Amino acid sequence: MVKRTHGYRYKSRKLLSKAPRERGMSGLSRLLYEYKPGDKVVIDIDPTFISTAPHRRYQGKVGVVIGTRGRAYVIETYIGDKKKIIITTPEHLRPHLGG
């Protein structure tokens, strides 16, 4: 038998797809929201923008904005005890409303 591949988007069919009524561009408020260093954000992957999307393991994670790189934001989050740095655009972020 041939070994099955495990690519970057492996096991993400439901996660990285939109329902028919959600297709198309997101609202402008999500794209134009300005984050400042120290703001808490939720990583919420938008499947419309594939090239700037973080890996699916970060979906739903809460992180802290530590800076910018061009239009993108540098986010610090944790996977278990490990600190991870993610660089992604505002399409994949939303403000964290919790405490």
UniProtKB/Swiss-Prot annotation:
GO biological process annotation, one example: translation
Span of the signal peptide: none
Keyword annotations from UniProtKB, A to Z: Ribonucleoprotein, Ribosomal protein
An annotated Gene Ontology molecular function: structural constituent of ribosome
Keyword Ribonucleoprotein: yes
InterPro entries: Ribosomal_eL21 (IPR001147), Ribosomal_eL21_arc (IPR022856), Ribosomal_eL21_CS (IPR018259), Ribosomal_eL21_sf (IPR036948), Translation_prot_SH3-like_sf (IPR008991)
Keyword Electron transport assigned: no
GO cellular component, one term: ribosome
UniProt record similarity statement: Belongs to the eukaryotic ribosomal protein eL21 family.
Protein name as catalogued: Large ribosomal subunit protein eL21
